[in-house]
């Protein structure tokens, strides 16, 4: 009689193990204007339930192990994330080599139309993944960090049909403030109060948003500098701040939930 409980316990353990999260990392490739891009689709395949899809643009170092871990953390059981390659598969700045990252981002900062075209294409590619990933295409959004924050704000300015965009310590400036009239998404921008790189553009950004019909929020996180969500950064002007990071992630989840559910 003691054998039966043992078998039951073993069966329950095996079922529990099978139900555990398994984060999928699947390459997604496309060509745009002669450049080959290689992004990564990230999601938990323990469940086949459809969930919102997010375009995620990492910081200026682009796709690397740290960015993938962050995408997995955010995706959890809640989202399917397309971690987006904005440079092309042959351009991969090495972490810590700011000169390489600066060279990679320069053409996109110089020509914002190209930046918008590339992230618009990333959104189209995310939608296409619904054929073989559990994406609810009625619930799409974009999030970005540092350079990626700039990119997702430009996605909103392009008039993309997404429910929301969320920018973490992203650049706030634009080449054309009039584009704000195109915004359909709810816009959440979060920046550190002591971020010397982005905060000088804060007033212009708010004026830009006021001149649009967008539903927007601009959150200033006290005592935080640039890079406050970037766990590997620890320099005076670009430093991880666990308190600001945790608060910003809570704000992100709340913003996305409200946007997807149509609540204020």
Regions found by a protein language model. Name each.
Residues 27-135, 229-234:
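Serine-hydrolase catalytic machinery in alpha/beta-hydrolase-like enzymes
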Residues 70, 199-209:
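Short alpha-helix in the alpha/beta-hydrolase fold that links the catalytic acid
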Residues 132-145:
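Alpha/beta-hydrolase fold nucleophile elbow
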Residues 144-148, 152:
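Gly/Ala-rich beta-loop-alpha elbow adjacent to hydrolase catalytic centers
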Residues 161-171:
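A conserved short beta-strand
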Residues 183, 189-191:
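Short beta-strand/loop motif that positions the catalytic acidic residue
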Residues 194-198:
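Acidic catalytic loop of the alpha/beta-hydrolase fold
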Residues 210, 215-264:
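C-terminal catalytic histidine-bearing segment of alpha/beta-hydrolase fold enzymes
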């Amino acid at each position: 009689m003691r054998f039966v409980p043992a078998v039951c316990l073993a069966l329950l353990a095996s079922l529990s193990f099978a139900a555990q999260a398994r984060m999928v990392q699947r390459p997604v490739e496309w060509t745009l204007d002669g450049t080959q891009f290689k992004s990564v689709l990230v999601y938990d395949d323990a469940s086949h339930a459809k969930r919102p899809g997010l375009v995620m643009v990492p910081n200026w170092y682009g796709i690397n192990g740290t960015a993938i871990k962050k995408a997995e953390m955010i995706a959890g059981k809640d989202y399917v994330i397309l971690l987006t390659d904005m440079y092309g598969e042959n351009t991969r700045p090495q972490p810590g080599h700011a000169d390489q990252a600066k060279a990679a981002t320069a053409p996109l900062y110089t020509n914002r139309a190209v930046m918008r075209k590339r992230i618009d294409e990333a959104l189209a590619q995310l939608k296409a993944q619904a054929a073989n990933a559990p994406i609810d295409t009625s619930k799409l959004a974009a999030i970005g960090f540092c350079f990626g924050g700039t990119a997702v704000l430009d996605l909103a300015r392009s008039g993309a049909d997404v429910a929301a965009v969320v920018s973490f310590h992203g650049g706030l400036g634009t080449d054309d403030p009039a584009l704000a009239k195109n915004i359909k998404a709810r816009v959440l921008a979060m920046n550190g109060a002591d971020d010397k790189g982005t905060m000088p553009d804060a007033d212009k950004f708010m004026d830009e948003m006021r001149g649009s019909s967008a539903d927007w929020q601009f959150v200033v996180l006290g005592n935080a500098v640039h890079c406050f969500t970037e766990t590997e950064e620890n320099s005076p002007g670009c430093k991880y701040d666990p308190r600001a990071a945790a608060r910003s992630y809570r704000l992100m989840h709340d913003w996305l939930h409200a946007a997807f559910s149509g609540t204020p």
